[in-house]
């Protein structure tokens, strides 16, 4: 199985900040990389698929980039509603494995 690693398990930022969350695959996944958002209430939403394609209805402050084994999710102008845990997922092979998640919190 392909292993997905998110080395930062939690991240603290201020409202309005630009935040970048990283993800690494154990082998080349040819841009088959998705990002999911899990809100504190458990709601899960697909944000980005195929590295950089924004899912319908997702605000443009979210963006994705990367290639090969290294990928990132960037949130520009952080808003309160962005407080959540973010997971990367590879879609190249089955099983479609996930990273361990990065919990984003507001710096007070």
UniProtKB/Swiss-Prot annotation:
Residues 1-23 are annotated as: Framework-1. Residues 35-49 are annotated as: Framework-2. Residues 24-34 are annotated as: Complementarity-determining-1. Disulfide bonds join 23-88. Coiled coil: none annotated. Keywords: Adaptive immunity, Disulfide bond, Immunity, Immunoglobulin. Residues 50-56 are annotated as: Complementarity-determining-2. Residues 89-97 are annotated as: Complementarity-determining-3. GO terms for biological process: adaptive immune response; immune response. Residues 98-108 are annotated as: Framework-4. One of its GO terms (cellular component) is immunoglobulin complex. InterPro entries: Ig-like_dom, Ig-like_dom_sf, Ig-like_fold, Ig_sub, Ig_V-set, IgV_Light_Chain. Pfam families: V-set. Residues 57-88 are annotated as: Framework-3. Anti-arsonate hybridoma protein. This is Ig kappa chain V-V region HP 124E1. It comes from Mus musculus (Mouse). The lineage of its organism: Eukaryota, Metazoa, Chordata, Craniata, Vertebrata.
């Amino acid at each position: 199985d392909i292993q997905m690693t998110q080395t930062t398990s939690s991240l603290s930022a201020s409202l309005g900040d630009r935040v970048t969350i990283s993800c690494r695959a154990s082998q080349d996944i040819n841009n088959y990389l998705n990002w999911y958002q899990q809100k504190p209430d458990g709601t899960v939403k697909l944000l980005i698929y195929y590295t950089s394609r924004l899912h319908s209805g997702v605000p443009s402050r979210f963006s994705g980039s990367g290639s090969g084994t290294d990928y990132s999710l960037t949130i520009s102008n952080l808003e309160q509603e962005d407080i959540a845990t973010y997971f990367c997922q590879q879609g190249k092979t089955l099983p479609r494995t996930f990273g361990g998640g990065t919990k984003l919190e507001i710096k007070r």
